[in-house]
Amino acid sequence: PFGSYVFADIGPVTGLPPADILEEYRFLTDTFLAAGARHFLFETNSSTEGLVETAAHIKQVAPDAFVLTSFSAFPGGYTRDGFFVEELVREVTESGYIDAVGFNCVSGVRPMKELVHLLGTCSLPVSLMPNAGHPIVIDGRTFYESAPDYFGTSLAALVHDGISIVGGCCGTTPEHIHALCRALAAGAGEADRENGQYVHAAMTAAQSPFFEALKAGEIPIAVELDPPDTGNADKFMVGARELMAAGVSAITIADNPIARARMDAAMLAGRVQRSLGLEPIPHMTCRDRNLNAIKSILLGLSAEGVHNMIAITGDPIPTAERDEVKSVYQFNSRKLSSFIKSLGERGDVVPFHVFGALNVNALHFPSQLGLAKKKMEAGMTGFFTQPVLSTRARENLRTARDTLPGAFILGGIMPVVSERNARFMESEIAGIHVEERIINAYHGLNRAEAEDLAVRISLEIAKDIEPYIDGYYIITPFARTALVARIVEGIKTRRGAK
């Protein structure tokens, strides 16, 4: 009776396995279809998960249905899941099942205009439903301060930029919509595309001697060195110099391992790069940072000339500390890799070489291989494995070599320094398995004898796994860089100092 369309409004379904997400969307859309709905709005999405399949189902049931998919993104063009809006819009547009695309929520009118510029040309009608400005919190309540007339006039101006559908999201009231209608009727607003579409100049991949050595089949050696747990990095830098003198190709720097705060891996990587000229490979976990913090660090690393990194989800925070220390986990390692890749493709950073972790000690290794393939699809170029300290790990490594063509694999070696150390790793460190024969070999040895044995065992493992790897990844125990330097020198001597 009002001459208006009625839309079935469906928010994002997240946090479930893919099959369950599709099932939930199917239930929601079938309920609306049974009630007679023929116009659907999928709003506030951060990814396309389940959307194309659901739209296809709607079209199969009701070919005349109209489907509008709306994404929520920050002004820089990235969603909270780390996807760039242009990629998301392209995916749903090319599916053929979506009738219109757009943006809603997160920001007000002017920041949302940036998304229109970033989007460029789109073959589908474009929708904008911004918030009524930025929120403020007073006495625990959220308010939006954008005046209706400003909202209406500003949004009406974007119609001149080719926007076909306009509306409001958080904080908008009937008066905001009335003001918008008045502005549209009066022809208010002028096209405001000052510089046309934003154009990002593509950056070429930086030269990385470590990565070039991988590609050339030179079997480079990377060594992990934990950052200090104080504000003094002198001992760390001395150890890095010692390893550099031994001939390592790169230093990897853990990011708050076992969820304990240490010196920031990215900042320390910049210092290593500037002070030593040794390639650093910082780890980046998803546990401690949101999208803004991650992007800031990536921009800084790019400026520092650090272009290799290991993306990992991160160890969980111990139960006893969770009241004081909160996890973030906005991403997992796959989403983080995809986000880093998109930053490079957009020209925001010099493209990174992103590596992931591969647990060769897993009891059900096929699931690890399946996960590794998904990581490669997300942009990872290779994997650093957990330490090989058992026959099972070596065989899994061989399987990985056969199963992951195109991936660079760096085989993990961790020197065992005592029987106590071996039993601790076997019993209390997730992802590590130490064979009993190795544990027993350390019985009764003093420190010097144990280190000599650690060198021999590590060199034996290095020789055994070399046919299946592209490089070595040696993990330094207890900051004993002199011990690791002996292993590095032993590997290089056996290989003819290649």
PLM feature spans:
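Domain-level signal for soluble alpha/beta catalytic cores
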Residues: 1-498
